[in-house]
Curated annotation (Swiss-Prot):
This is Chaperone protein HtpG. Residues 563-637 are annotated as: C. Molecular chaperone. Has ATPase activity. GO terms for molecular function: ATP binding; ATP hydrolysis activity; ATP-dependent protein folding chaperone; unfolded protein binding. Residues 346-562 are annotated as: B. Keywords: ATP-binding, Chaperone, Cytoplasm, Nucleotide-binding, Stress response. GO terms for cellular component: cytoplasm. Belongs to the heat shock protein 90 family. It holds the Pfam family HATPase_c_3. Residues 1-345 are annotated as: A. PROSITE patterns: HSP90. It is found in: Cytoplasm. Its main location: cytoplasm.
Length: 637
């Protein structure tokens, strides 16, 4: 018995339909790209499920997609004999957009038709592109393995609602009929559709067929009879798995179109690597580095990974087991000869073949990036701007490749004099002073705060380069990256500066002399500040600033404390080391102050000033302002 129901579209779908109908007029042909791609995916899914239940084929194992037109009726039909849909899945998939992607989709819309059209497939809303050219869309579908009387009819004119009805459908799979708008009748032309299929779908491994009309029997030039030719369905695409072909036979354009098909990113990839591994493990990898970061790169709940095929049979999307998380931006596929066809995500978790492939694929990607950095530094900088922060997760996650990952990192530096992150650790080492055995760095809230930090004063005076780090992830990175090519990374804001051989005999003599002369001042400061500091000492790093605060060698840095507090984590109490510069006029004036209360106020003011410079904030700014005003008034008299 037919059950007809009318459903209202989800609000977000209404917005999307308006976008399709009114905004994407400049790239209308994408509707066929999207619908053919969806149909091919449905065939892949059936092939996978039929591995364990070949009854799903229902006697028809030749999977294909068919495209046909009817000029008189003004329709285009895209059909497949893939997995099909049940009534519930029709309502779910053709009436709503997954909540997880809805907000991001609309936030990413730019208002530029070409850019927005590229987002459609990326956000899994390709079906709705049918309404770019259609005034009405009719879908007939039946899920494989279900009886013929459980077919479903879905129909909508792209307004506020859609109808769903139970029908009889003898063949499994899905048929989508587009009733073209009057102004879109060009798409009812066979040759127009053939050219679109060749352009976008040549790489799809499922045959995409169109009907070639037959010919009546006719008389030849010599009077012989030429037999009639029956009409037949013929593939319009190569229908072979691109990655199985010889690299030399594949054009750059074919590689790029295949990337767009598997990634739903309709901008060209930055680089790719196509490789066949033979030996103990046999597999083919086709790996792409995107040019732009995907919208969900920072969404930890969203799966990332490669498409997995076993002996050319599609097994699963987003197989995360073959790449470490810091390479989650990589797109592509693996085709293994060693994994079983019934492989599951659970089996992949603990599998020697998986582990070996993961090691190989990771090395392949790192090699690709190293080559890009060496041969095309400009292109690598484009990559770094998009994915650098993700790559910085690598040293903590992948100990075996820590040195290689570190070589790919880029930083701002006092040598460059700009915020551009273009300096590699190799660059830094190549410019190190004679006798320098450490890589000096500073982590701050912003590039400006790092570049203008008083902790750099002595190093600048001596011409020693300092790496300037200001990304949120940098403090975390540096806790896991402590050395590169035998050179220790040393924070200029923690512990002693440790210049080693960069400090000559005259420097040491001057430091010892000023430390001895300031002993009394240091003791008075300790008494005045009491529990506010862990230690007061003469600075080894300041030349122009009166004082600074420094974290102890084994203590948390200011930036790490901020990160933990922002994450709502408890932070162990710590007190800074207070370093003073006796050569600064303010400190020299303080040394002559006989009034102990006034001395204590000045000492407190200098401490809070140093903390403000280091942290960018104070625990009690009102008390600081009150004390400052008090001191200003006293000096104004």
């Amino acid at each position: 018995m037919s059950q007809q129901e009318t459903h209202g579209f989800q609000t977000e779908v209404k917005q999307l339909l308006q976008l399709m109908i009114h905004s994407l007029y400049s790239n209308k042909e994408i509707f066929l790209r999207e619908l053919v791609s969806n149909a091919a995916d449905a065939a892949d899914k059936l092939r996978y499920l039929a591995l364990t239940d070949d009854a799903l084929y229902e006697g028809d194992g030749e999977l294909r997609v068919r495209v046909s037109t009817d000029k008189e009726k003004g329709t285009v039909t895209i059909s497949d004999n893939g997995i099909g849909m049940t009534r519930d899945s029709v309502i779910e998939h053709l009436g709503t957009i997954a909540k997880s992607g809805t907000k991001e989709f609309f936030n990413n819309l730019s208002g530029e038709a070409n850019k927005d059209s590229q987002l459609i497939g990326q956000f899994g809303v390709g079906f709705y592109s049918a309404f770019i050219v259609a005034k009405k869309v009719t879908v007939r579908t039946r899920a494989a393995g279900h009886p013929a009387n459980e077919g479903v009819l879905w129909e909508s004119e792209g307004e506020g609602s859609f109808n769903v009805e139970t029908i009889t459908k003898n063949s499994r799979g899905t048929e989508i009929v587009l009733h073209l708008r009057d102004e879109e009748k060009e798409f009812a032309d066979d040759w127009r559709l053939r050219s679109i299929i060749t352009k976008y779908s040549d790489h799809i491994s499922v045959p995409v067929e169109m009907f070639e009309a037959g010919k009546d029997a006719q008389e030849g030039e010599d009077g012989e009879t030429i037999a009639a030719v029956e009409g037949q369905w013929k593939p319009m695409n190569k229908a072979t798995a691109l990655w199985t072909r010889n690299k030399s036979d594949i054009s750059d354009e074919e590689y790029q179109e295949f990337y767009k098909h598997i990634s739903h990113d309709y901008t060209d990839a930055l680089k790719w690597s196509h490789n066949r591994v033979e030996g103990k493990q046999e597999y083919t990898s086709l790996l792409y580095i995107p040019a732009k970061a995907p919208w969900d790169m920072w969404n930890r709940d969203h799966k990332h990974g490669l498409k997995l095929f076993v002996q050319r049979v599609f097994i699963m999307d987003e197989a995360e087991q073959f790449l470490p998380n810091y390479l989650r931006f990589v797109r592509g596929l693996l085709d293994s000869n060693d994994l079983p066809l019934n492989v599951s995500r659970e089996i992949l978790q603990d599998n020697q073949v998986t582990t070996a492939m993961r090691v190989g694929v990771t090395k392949r990607v790192l090699g690709m990036l190293e080559k890009l950095a060496k041969d095309e530094p400009g292109q690598y900088q484009s990559f770094w701007a998009e994915f650098g922060q993700v790559l910085k997760e690598g040293p903590a996650e992948d100990f075996a490749n820590k040195e290689r990952i570190a070589g790919l990192l880029r930083f701002a530096s006092t040598h460059e004099g700009s915020a551009a992150t273009t300096v590699s650790l190799e660059d830094y080492i190549s410019r190190m002073k004679e006798g320098q055995d450490k890589i000096y760095y500073i982590v701050a809230d912003s590039h400006e705060a790092a570049a203008n930090s008083p902790h750099l004063e002595l190093l600048r005076k001596k011409g020693i380069e300092v790496l300037l780090m200001s990304e949120r992830i940098d403090e975390w990175l540096i806790n896991h990256l402590t050395e590169f090519k035998g050179k220790k990374l040393h924070s200029v804001t923690r512990g002693d500066l440790e210049l080693g051989e960069l400090e000559d005999a005259a420097d040491k003599e001057a430091k010892d002399k000023i430390t001895e002369e300031a002993k009394g001042l240091v003791e008075r400061m300790k008494a005045a500040l009491g529990a506010k500091v862990s230690e007061v000492k003469v600075t080894t790093r300041l030349t122009d600033t009166p004082a600074c605060v420094v974290a102890g060698e084994g203590e948390m840095s200011t930036q790490m404390i901020k990160l933990m507090q922002a994450a709502g984590q408890a932070v162990p109490e710590s007190k800074p080391t207070f370093e003073i510069n006796p050569n600064h006029p303010l400190v020299a004036r303080l040394n002559d102050e006989a009034d102990e209360q006034l001395f204590a106020d000045w000492a407190s003011l200098l401490l809070q000033q140093a903390q403000l410079s280091e942290k960018g904030s104070l625990a009690d700014p009102s008390a600081f302002i009150k004390l400052m005003n008090q001191m200003l008034l006293a000096n104004a008299k």
